């Protein structure tokens, strides 16, 4: 039995509704996508550092909600990494054993995805086919990126994490959020789910969920927004970078103030990538 949490649905549904409004604003407010200011991915952004043109387009309220989600995410990680007595939850450093486990797992998952794509090429066309070929052309580079991981350069710590963190694992409660479903990745073994990992893996999972929500909105409303698909993609990527920046600023500030060792800027960016 679990306690009932009063809620207005999950954050995935909430974000889709928000994204629809944001893309609708492009035409409603006659926004010129090419004129919107750009920003680097993973650049931390306080609210007052977000250009007024972006605030006018996206709306202040969405950035404030993203900040709240970031705060709750950091609080979750601080709680999971604060037990110094129970060894199953004590923070730990990177080591050779973890690196072997990580590389084997990544390469196994990568090969599975590779096989799926190779066996599905005949079903694809258009942009999906182009992206599939692009992925296959870069498979050696991707594999090398995994193999070259060097744990000796990592200064942050690993903890028990959520493990399957995305918008669907979050309930909306007024202006706040509840995080739930801590059982980890469904496709992972119980043993693998217990492996301590960088908390930024959860953060990256949430960012991927932001990205999915943006593109689900574009693809599911193709006839609604009076723009070429490429223009919507450009707006979507820009929106993604600003949401990520607002999330990171709040998350990193709270995590570091709670003595959660997530590393310095270079390591944070490396792990997120």
Residue ranges and their predicted role:
Residues 113-159:
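An alpha-helical support segment within catalytic cores of ATP-dependent transferases
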Residues 266-273:
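Amphipathic alpha-helical protein-interaction segments enriched in hydrophobic
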Residues 1-119, 162, 167-169, 173-249, ...:
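Conserved ATP-binding subdomain of kinase catalytic cores across diverse folds
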């Amino acid at each position: 039995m679990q306690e009932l949490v009063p809620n207005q649905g999950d954050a995935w549904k909430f974000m889709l509704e928000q994204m629809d409004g944001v893309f609708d604003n492009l035409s409603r407010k006659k926004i010129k996508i090419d004129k919107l200011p750009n920003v680097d991915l993973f650049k931390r952004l306080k609210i007052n550092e977000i250009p007024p043109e972006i605030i006018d387009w996206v709306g202040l309220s969405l950035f404030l909600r993203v900040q709240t989600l970031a705060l709750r995410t950091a609080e979750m990680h601080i709680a999971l990494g604060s037990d110094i007595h129970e060894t199953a939850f004590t923070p730990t450093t990177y080591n050779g054993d973890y690196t072997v486990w990580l590389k084997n797992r990544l390469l196994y998952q990568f090969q599975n995805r590779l096989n799926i794509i190779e066996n599905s090429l005949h079903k694809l066309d258009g942009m999906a086919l182009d992206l599939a070929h692009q992925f296959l052309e870069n498979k050696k580079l991707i594999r090398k990126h995994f193999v070259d991981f060097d744990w000796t350069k990592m200064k942050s710590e690993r903890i028990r994490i959520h493990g399957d963190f995305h918008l669907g694992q979050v309930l909306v409660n007024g202006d706040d959020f509840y995080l739930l479903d801590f059982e980890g990745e469904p496709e992972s073994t119980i043993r693998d789910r217990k492996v301590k990992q960088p908390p930024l893996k959860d953060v990256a999972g949430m960012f991927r969920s932001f990205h999915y929500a943006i593109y689900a909105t574009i693809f599911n409303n193709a006839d609604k927004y009076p723009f070429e698909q490429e223009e919507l993609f450009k707006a979507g990527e820009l929106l993604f970078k600003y949401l990520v920046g607002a999330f990171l600023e709040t998350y990193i500030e709270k995590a570091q103030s709670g003595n959660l060792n997530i590393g310095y800027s270079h390591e944070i960016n490396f792990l997120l990538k």
